[in-house]
Amino acid sequence: MSSGNRSEAVDVQKSYEVRTYGCQMNVHDSERLSGLLEGAGYVRAPEGSDGDADVVVFNTCAVRENADNKLYGNLGRLAPMKTKRPGMQIAVGGCLAQKDRDTIVKRAPWVDVVFGTHNIGKLPVLLERARVQEEAQIEIAESLEAFPSTLPTRRESAYAAWVSISVGCNNTCTFCIVPALRGKEKDRRTGDILAEIEALVAEGVCEITLLGQNVNAYGSDIGDREAFSKLLRACGRIEGLERVRFTSPHPRDFTDDVIAAMAETPNVMPQLHMPMQSGSDTVLKAMRRSYRQERFLGIIEKVRAAMPEAAISTDIIVGFPGETEEDFEQTMHAVREARFANAFTFQYSKRPGTPAADMDGQIPKEVVQERYMRLSALQEQISWDENKKQVGRTLDVMVAEGEGRKDGATQRLSGRAPDNRLVHFTQPEKAVRPGDVVTVEITYAAPHHLLAEGTPLAVRSTRAGDAWEKRTTGAAAKPAGVMLGLPGIGAPEPLPAAGAPACGIG
């Protein structure tokens, strides 16, 4: 966009909305898309705008079978809005755009821009080109043009941040289309990662989550199998960084040096999300998961030996082609043995373009649903039992923003414990801010949250809370600009159980 057009955009405050679907990597990319648009002179549309913006960007997911229907349904709802709003533009990016390309404009000719996973930095240019030429711009790159972390960013929080350490994936899981859309794994330089973290901490961020499709394969580019554990230890030496998390590792690459680094680095949190996908060796082989049940449970045993307080969660697919009742019972057995704090269970969804889509033995939906309900019931009880063990414990909870839907009605606040469990607690007499740390005693446990009903034992104001206060005060005084931070607090939330395995799954 030319300087004249940029000035015009600022003068009339052209607005934008970014809608994000799918995994944490997409959320990370959407922060960059927002930063790019604000750098081009757009301002963020108010919450609840529901498409009432000058530019609406869809950052799509291609994992679920109904991802296409969801996108085109939403695009269809915007079509009449566009006819009533002169100059409105619609852009579609992400994995579904990378996959479908020309199909999107054929099915929704009112779309102005289609871009892929490798060229998100081109969005402002493509929007301007579409405006000037008055025709749709479709540009899909086949390889990464710029590491997303180098792009302008508009983060949503002043106290917690995603930090991407790699993009792409070298695995060939038969159910997953993501490697074909995100490309081969490409690692970021360790020095660049640490420099970004240090800059974030200087801005007030106190928690970071290292992000990649397969984080513990980090270093494969240079042949250093211990690069990820070294990175964790390096994070432990950054003054002011209180909490470090990561997502998601692959069991194949989960080595003892990583477990040691987790246990020996105080600011690496006692939490592990490691996708199992199935407990059946037969199904794991069909999935090309390159580990078996014994190996997976062995990793969990080692993690718990090193960190007895660790909360371990996972992803599981039910109804993969060829899964027998015996195979499913092996998954149930593995869940009983592992005793996950949480498990995100998904009904298998056929994705065109994946080997699993053409496999024999596709399971009837009613069978998949019945197994899914059995597994969900088992995990619900285990989650509750594991949470009950927290009652009576004293925990340091980092105050969150927007985590408790009922906080206003219950006069409580919410936050995350070190192991990432959600805690609702009584408001202390002293005012606290997101990013501050409150020490509480747990009095009650539910399957998906903990409750601390007594007066908090201590409140610690933090630089992160200061940063949030400064950010909030500044936002009230002037339009939002390019910020540092992250949506939400704690590790990025996994997809809801109704969804599908995320791109970040190992």
From Swiss-Prot:
[4Fe-4S] cluster 2 binds at C169, C173, C176. Binds 2 [4Fe-4S] clusters. One cluster is coordinated with 3 cysteines and an exchangeable S-adenosyl-L-methionine. Pfam families: Radical_SAM (PF04055), UPF0004 (PF00919). CDD domains: Radical_SAM. It catalyses: N(6)-dimethylallyladenosine(37) in tRNA + (sulfur carrier)-SH + AH2 + 2 S-adenosyl-L-methionine = 2-methylsulfanyl-N(6)-dimethylallyladenosine(37) in tRNA + (sulfur carrier)-H + 5'-deoxyadenosine + L-methionine + A + S-adenosyl-L-homocysteine + 2 H(+). [4Fe-4S] cluster 1 binds at C23, C61, C95. The keyword Iron-sulfur applies. It is found in: Cytoplasm. Signal peptide: none annotated. It comes from the Bacteria. Residues 388-456 form the TRAM domain. Catalyzes the methylthiolation of N6-(dimethylallyl)adenosine (i(6)A), leading to the formation of 2-methylthio-N6-(dimethylallyl)adenosine (ms(2)i(6)A) at position 37 in tRNAs that read codons beginning with uridine. This is tRNA-2-methylthio-N(6)-dimethylallyladenosine synthase. It comes from Streptomyces griseus subsp. griseus (strain JCM 4626 / CBS 651.72 / NBRC 13350 / KCC S-0626 / ISP 5235).
